C-alpha cells in the first residue's frame, strides 16, 4: 500500500482536490495523509479548515506557515518558513509520494522541501501559463521537481513534454474543476439566498479580485479601486463579492471590496469565502463572473456563463468564447461588464466548450497513483511530442 501525502493550503485548491482526497481515502491500495496548511488556518481567510472538517476527512497534520499578525510579510520569508516546517514534517512522516496541486508560492515551498528529501512529487495542473502572476515560475519549478504529472488539458500536457518531461509520466486527465461542476450537487437559488443572507433572486454577479504578482504588476489598491468604480457605474446587478487570496496585496484588495459592499448594502454583499458548494451553486445561477481568478477562465466554460477577466493575471491561459478580457482600468472594466450582460453575448457564452472535460478526472489520478513506479529515476526527454486528449482512457 502506498502512503500518499496530499497538501492543501487554500479554499480554492481544496475545492479542486476534494474528490481526489475522498477517493484516495477510500482506495484499498492507497493510504491518505492529509496535511492542512496556509490560508486554511488563518482567521483572516475565513478559517476554511472548517470546510474540510465538515466533510469528515481525516486530517493528519495542521501546519501553520503564515504570520497571522503580519499579513504583509514578504513572500520570501513565508517560503523559507514553509520549507523549514515541511522539512521537519517530512523527516518524521516520509510518504511514498506527495500530491500537490497548482502553483502557489507555499506549494512551491512544500515541493522544495519534498525534493530536498528525495520524496517523489505528483503534480496536478502543471504546464499551464499565467503570465500575469508569479505563479508562472513557481508552477514550472514544481514541474521540474515532479516525477508524475496530471495536466488538465492537451495544450498543457504537450507543453510539459516540451519542457523535458517524459511522455510516460504525463497523464492528461482533464480538470478537477470541470469534474466538480458536473458531479457536485448544487444548492437551489432559494437555498443560496438563505445561506448567504443576500437576495440572489435578482440578477447577480460573482466578483473575485486577486492582486497581480508579476514583476510588472500594478498597484493592487488602484486595480481594486478601478473595479469598484466600474461596479458602481453599472446598474441592474447585485455584486456578490468574495475575499482575495494570500498573495502580497491580497489584504488590500479584500479591504477595498469590503468597503465597497459596506457602502452599497442594497447593491453588493461581501463573503470572505463561499466554500466549494456555495461557489459552484452561485456560478450556476449567476448572470456573470467578474475578476481575475483562475476559476473565471478555467471553470466558467463548463457552465457557459459570461465572464469578465480583468488585467493580466490569467494571461497565457486558454480563453474560451464565454470570457471577455479587459484592462484593469475603470472605463475598460465598465465597458466589458455592460457587454457581458447583453443577450447577444450571453448566447455566445452559453455555447462555450470546455477544453478541461476529462470525465472521471479524480478517479484517473487515483488509479495512476496506485500503479505508477515512483522508484524509477527521472529523465530529461528530448523526443517528439505525442498527441494528448483528456477524454482518452488512462493506461500505464
Q: Language-model segments: what does each one mean?
A:
Residues 5-15, 101-105, 210-221, 288:
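Short, glycine-rich nucleotide/cofactor-binding loops
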Residues 7-8, 14-25, 65-167:
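Active-site and donor-binding regions of nucleotide-sugar-utilizing enzymes
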Residues 8, 41-43, 145-222, 377:
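A nucleotide-sugar donor-handling region in carbohydrate enzymes
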Residues 30-78, 85:
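Conserved nucleotide-sugar phosphate-binding/catalytic loop shared by glycosyltransferases and other
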Residues 52, 186-285:
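Donor-nucleotide binding loops and adjacent catalytic segments primarily
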Residues 100-101, 108, 149, 275-321:
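A donor-sugar binding/catalytic signature common to diverse glycosyltransferases
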Residues 342-396:
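C-terminal amphipathic helix plus adjacent low-complexity
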